[in-house]
Amino acid sequence: MKKTGVFYHDICGKQAYSSLAMGVQEGFESIEQEGFFTKPNVKWFESRQATEAEIGRLHSQQWIDEVKKTQWWTVSLHSVGGMLGATEKVLKGEIDNALVIAGVGGHHAHRDSAWGGCYFNVISLGIPHARATLNTKRFAIVDTDTHHADGVRDLFMKDDDVLHICFCNSYSWDYDTADRMESSTKMCFPHGSSDETEIRNVEREVPARIKEFKPEMIYWLCGMDTHQDSYGTQALTEKCYPKLAKIIKGVADEVCQGKLIVKTCFNAPPHATRYAAPRIVDCLAETGKYS
């Protein structure tokens, strides 16, 4: 079994950007109700607040000050803080992998602007934090949200030590002709129009590219707006997300000693997050509960 951390603060559920993060509290509660926090290898860590200095590694002070004026300031701090805490504990070897449950999005956040329920770039902020404090250089980000991760791409476009694989709405066909290769480390691929095509596309593109790139850690943005009852492609069922977790965890185990952080804001209805959340934790922690 693996040691798995779940990073979450109650504010991320109660103050979630609710039109986007529809099932945050229910997703976390389902993990608890299924008994995972009674297992010796699964632990809940309350997400701390990130500091302005930590956020300032990627975002301008002007943008930080703008976010302060919004009602999403505190939930954004805890969302980023959970990611930083998970990054620290995984890279220090205190846990093997982690699930970070945020109350806001992140991948549409640029240095000094954002849109789409995003304020700070939650996953991306883990990378300069790891580089500054944990002597880690090389990362892969896999994004299976329905929308293009324009903020992540913008922040790391010139950084060849970050592999960014995005399965995004801009190229949503089930054909190779939709692929867009911006560079050897920045690429977009189509997401699927069903569980089967989504799994096929991720299996086709992710493992081999990550094995070739050899990151020291993998981040996976598990966007659930691809769910058939959410606001995105409305293509997938809740059964797809644990299967994606298995694929991405498998390559992390092979390439970087299992160092994997899954970030989600559970942007799907509660019935979907209640199903997917505990099964993703089961996959990460290798408990075999649903085998």
What are these regions (language model features)?
Residues K3, R57-S291:
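A general "terminal functional-core" signal
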